[in-house]
Amino acid sequence: MNPEQFQTALAEKGIELSDTQLKQFHDYFEMLVEWNEKMNLTAITDEKEVYLKHFYDSISAAFYVDFTKFDTICDVGAGAGFPSLPIKICFPHLKVSIVDSLKKRMTFLDALAEKLGLTDVHFYHDRAETFGQNKAHREKYDLVTARAVARMSVLSELCMPLVKKGGSFLVMKAAQAEQELQTAEKAIKLFGGKVEEHFAFSLPVEESERNIYVITKTKETPNKYPRKPGTPNKLPIE
């Protein structure tokens, strides 16, 4: 998917990009490839692949969820900024917080946000388990996103405490998500969530499977969650 195809594909979904936004995506790609030579940000560096598997894939959530209804977003373990920064470029009104435990990724994201001229973007170098117990952030976000390889039961413990009551947790998964959801149902309920919607679709060009789950926060997460760093991964609630 080249930049022109990317622009057309988004326009077909109702997302019209300005010249400024297209330049932001171009600069994002260039910085990603440049910095990737110094640090391991992504295995995907080909332009067409980046536009499809990072940019388009991140924004695909907006085909099913109305981001104009949200004000604050927290992205847990965003790595090189996915999915939150491509979403932020498309929806500039959003106030975005990104949490990641690797300091070098924070350095990249800081430089990237400055280069792209992104405002209302904040980066936190922290473990998700610690961040979720921080009163300044706990149950403060309209939407929390995760596009990660961790199991859904683990992601739920890391992300649900950050979602405000009435807000949403958006899980982006590749294949075999249904099986994961079944093992995560106990955890989702325990942390105050309810699975509201599931969208299954294929990425264009390569037709790889994608799943998006929208989990609504119906009640507060018990204070003891998330547990200490490392525990959710070692002893997932399933």
UniProtKB/Swiss-Prot annotation:
Annotated EC: 2.1.1.-
Subcellular location: Cytoplasm
Keyword Calcium assigned: no
GO CC annotation terms, alphabetical: cytosol
UniProt-listed CDD domains: AdoMet_MTases
Keywords: Cytoplasm, Methyltransferase, rRNA processing, S-adenosyl-L-methionine, Transferase
NCBIfam families: rsmG_gidB
Family: Belongs to the methyltransferase superfamily. RNA methyltransferase RsmG family.
This protein's name: Ribosomal RNA small subunit methyltransferase G
